[in-house]
Amino acid sequence: MPPPVAAREAIGDAKEHGRPGQSGIEKAQRSIERTLAFAAAMLSRLRSKRRRRSLSRTMTVLGWIAVMAICGYVGLTAMIYLTQRSLMYFPERTHVTPAEAGLPEATEVPLTTADGVQIRVWHVPPKADNPVILYFHGNGGALNYRVERFRQLVSAGIGLVGLEYRGYGGLGGSPSEQGLIRDAEAAYAFAVAHYPAQQLVLWGESLGSGVAVALAAEKPVGRVILEAPFTSALAVGERRYWYLPVQLLMKDQFRSDERIQKVTAPLLILHGMHDRVVPYAMGERLFDLANKPKHIVRFLDGGHEDLDNNGALDAVARFLAGDLD
């Protein structure tokens, strides 16, 4: 049935004036869809560019952070390498005589090492044929810091040859592993010029334990005492500076772990269980590596510098008397 006249006229009027029918609406919808799709594509493209720019900026920042971290690490490594001896040795540079320190029995004797450095020892002869302690102190202070210990030894009739290292106690020169060993050799030469080698007892305290082991590995002595000893200064450095290639950087490694098996004299190790400078485990390890006869005394409440307060001198007296054998 044909549409009513009014409807035909309306349709004809629409065609005449260009008003869209159903096909025009579809075209308009497609046009809108294309426009929206184009806008979405442009927006996506814009977001992608922003993401790329943001990612690029992030990568640039991370790159600079990495460069700065590498430069900082290299700089820190170089600084520690160049200043390592000042980090390892803490000398008291003031010269204090034995009398000023409170040990008037001691005579201060100047010595010259094989490499021409002037050093000195404090000398107190023993009573009768008592042992003579050839003493190597730690990396801090000087001989006068140990005067209370020396007084107790001397009052018991024990002799003393206390070594003051180069660079310590107002002396010239700079401390190093080779330098300290040469100092020890000069002190040993002085001691054996006055006493039989078997009368000598090497006592090395902390850093001095490395000196004592190095000397005892090459020279005959009666006994050796190691107080708070390390397996090596290298091991201490690796523990403290775990983030650095210490083995490649460290000059003065004091490898007691490699030298101890050449020591044949009776050995006593003293170590505090609460030592936070040289862990007790290092003393235990060095003891395991050492030859017999050997003894270790563990101080349950002892730290690094307080062993005299925990009975160290009593243990030394028993060792010298042969009561620990």
For each feature predicted by the language model, list its residue ranges.
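Post-His helix in hydrolase/transferase enzymes
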Residues: 308-320
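Membrane-embedded segments
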Residues: 118-190
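Catalytic histidine neighborhood in serine/cysteine hydrolases
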Residues: 290-305
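An N-terminal hydrophobic leader/cap segment in hydrolases
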Residues: 70-110
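Hydrolase active-site cap/lid region
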Residues: 210-265, 309
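Short alpha-helix in the alpha/beta-hydrolase fold that links the catalytic acid
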Residues: 279-288
